[in-house]
């Protein structure tokens, strides 16, 4: 009996020590992008934090989340300051030059928010020859990149970049800009929270979301992708997305 108790105690101590020594991965995000990431109380919550937690648990890691400015995410993970980034991050060829991406876990749609009485009724109005609107975006996002190319560089208006989506929407509410280009899901949250705004029916851009890592961190990317595949197959990740974005 003493030998059995001693063995059980040794096993318990070993498991406890293993849990205590579990390595922590740091995920950076910009928590102003509901429902993918946002602050609730003193916690960063949303689709990305929940998927990251599930993936880290599957890989055997603890998870730490750092909330920082969106335009510092790529440089931060590329330099090794963070282990990975999940922030509704769109996969682009330009970003692929600086970081490695995981497999895609969600699809995003860029839309346009306007005031209900806006003369802008479609994407075509915004991109028409002779158009001269001021368009708000979040700095360093794909919405900003697309708008610069389609609108400002094409001489069809001006692009105003803001630190986050909320500030862009507040500028629209206060009449400082004519519209906001942003992803569909946070757009829904902003329109619901601010009377007098609407989302145009026409889609601006469709894009893929993925986690990103330092270019040389191939081992972690492979582990992440393997866990992502398992959690997608067993329904965990679809359930997380469905929790925040119910199927219509």
Predicted regions, residues:
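Extracytoplasmic small-molecule ligand-binding "clamshell" domains
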Residues: 23-88
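A ligand-binding cleft/hinge motif common to bilobed small-molecule-binding domains
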Residues: 72, 89-97, 145-149, 171-174, ...
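Alpha-to-beta junction loops
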Residues: 61-62, 78-87, 131-134, 164, ...
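Ligand-binding clefts/hinges and TM-proximal coupling segments of bilobed small-molecule sensing domains
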Residues: 62-64, 142-160, 195-201, 226-248
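Short beta-strand-centered segments that line the small-molecule binding cleft or hinge
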Residues: 74-88, 96-109, 197-200
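Flexible hinge/capping segments at coil-to-helix
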Residues: 114-134
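Short helix-initiation/N-cap motifs at beta->coil->alpha
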Residues: 49, 64-77, 121, 159-174, ...
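Periplasmic-binding protein-like
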Residues: 31, 107-114, 184, 188-229, ...
């Amino acid at each position: 009996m003493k030998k059995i108790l001693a063995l059980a105690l040794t096993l318990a101590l070993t498991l406890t020590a293993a849990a205590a020594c579990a390595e922590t991965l740091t995920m950076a995000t910009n928590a102003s992008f509901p429902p993918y990431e946002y602050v609730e109380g003193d916690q960063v919550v949303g689709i990305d934090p929940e998927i990251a937690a599930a993936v880290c648990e599957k890989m055997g890691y603890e998870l730490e989340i750092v909330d920082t400015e969106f335009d510092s995410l790529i440089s931060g993970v590329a330099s090794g300051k963070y282990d990975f980034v999940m922030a509704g991050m769109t996969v682009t060829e330009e970003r692929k030059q600086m970081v490695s991406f995981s497999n895609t876990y969600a699809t995003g749609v860029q839309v346009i928010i306007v005031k209900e009485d806006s003369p802008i009724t479609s994407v075509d109005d915004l991109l028409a020859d002779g158009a001269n609107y001021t368009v708000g975006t979040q700095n360093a996002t794909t919405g900003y990149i697309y708008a610069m190319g389609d609108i400002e560089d094409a001489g069809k208006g001006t692009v105003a970049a803001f630190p986050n989506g909320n500030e862009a929407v507040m500028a629209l509410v206060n009449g400082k800009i004519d519209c906001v280009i942003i992803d569909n899901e946070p757009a829904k949250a902003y329109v619901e929270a601010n009377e007098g705004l609407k989302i145009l029916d026409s889609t601006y851009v469709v894009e893929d979301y993925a986690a990103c890592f330092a270019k040389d961190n191939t081992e972690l990317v492979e582990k992440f992708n393997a866990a992502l595949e398992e959690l997608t197959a067993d329904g965990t990740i679809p359930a997380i997305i469905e929790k925040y974005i119910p199927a219509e």
